[in-house]
């Protein structure tokens, strides 16, 4: 298990939430993640008038991960605009699985949880036919 400074990640996530574009819900979300090379990447939610096109903060973290050099996510904190811990939605859990695997630690109000515990029996690379991998 990686040594994670959860307070630092929550603080970075709260700062990221300050940049959220949320004119419809007014519900700012920020996320921050520790990368396997020691970097911290952040993201915020960006709403769209066509609600289904809204981008979650966790997806923005994955974009930041790849636009700053790639790597694997080790730990992620997601918070609202006041710094209260939030859990990623199901869609985001699936996206995070691709970039951190089942061992990715997700901040939780009680204790950090493995993504594999939050998304059991997830669809993954092994579910694709071999010729598509």
Curated annotation (Swiss-Prot):
Q: Which Pfam families match?
A: dCMP_cyt_deam_1
Alphabetical GO CC annotations of the entry are: cytosol; plasma membrane
CMP/dCMP-type deaminase domain mapped to chain residues = 4-126
What keywords is this UniProt entry annotated with? Hydrolase, Metal-binding, Zinc
User: Where Zn(2+) is bound, by residue?
Assistant: 56, 89, 92
Catalytic center at which residues?
58
The record, for InterPro entries, names: CMP_dCMP_dom, Cyt/Deoxycyt_deaminase, Cytidine_deaminase-like
**Molecular function GO terms recorded:** cytidine deaminase activity; zinc ion binding
Cofactor binding mode and count? Binds 1 Zn(2+) ion per subunit.
Per UniProt, substrate binds at 45-47
Q: What is its EC number?
A: 3.5.4.5
Tell me one GO biological process term. Answer: cytidine deamination
Return the Gene3D superfamilies for the record: Cytidine Deaminase, domain 2 (3.40.140.10)
* Reaction(s) catalysed by this chain's protein: cytidine + H2O + H(+) = uridine + NH4(+); 2'-deoxycytidine + H2O + H(+) = 2'-deoxyuridine + NH4(+)
Query: Which cofactors does this protein require?
Result: Zn(2+)
Which CDD domains does the UniProt record give? cytidine_deaminase (cd01283)
Function, please? Recycles cytidine and 2-deoxycytidine for uridine and 2-deoxyuridine synthesis, respectively. Catalyzes the hydrolytic deamination of cytidine and 2-deoxycytidine to form, respectively, uridine and 2-deoxyuridine.
Subunit notes for this chain?
A: Homotetramer.
Q: Which family does it belong to?
A: Belongs to the cytidine and deoxycytidylate deaminase family.
This chain's protein is named Cytidine deaminase
């Amino acid at each position: 298990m990686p040594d994670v400074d959860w307070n630092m990640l929550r603080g970075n996530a709260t700062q990221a939430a300050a940049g959220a574009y949320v004119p419809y819900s007014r519900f700012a979300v920020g996320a921050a993640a520790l990368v396997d090379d020691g970097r911290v990447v952040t993201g915020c939610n960006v709403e769209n008038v066509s609600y289904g096109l809204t981008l979650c903060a966790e997806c923005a973290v994955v974009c930041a991960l790849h636009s700053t050099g790639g790597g694997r996510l080790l730990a992620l904190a997601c918070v609202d605009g006041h710094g209260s811990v939030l859990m990623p939605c199901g869609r985001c859990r699936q996206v995070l699985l691709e970039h951190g695997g089942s061992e990715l630690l997700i901040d939780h109000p009680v204790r950090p949880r493995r993504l594999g515990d939050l998304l059991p029996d997830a669809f993954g690379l092994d579910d694709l036919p071999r010729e598509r991998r």
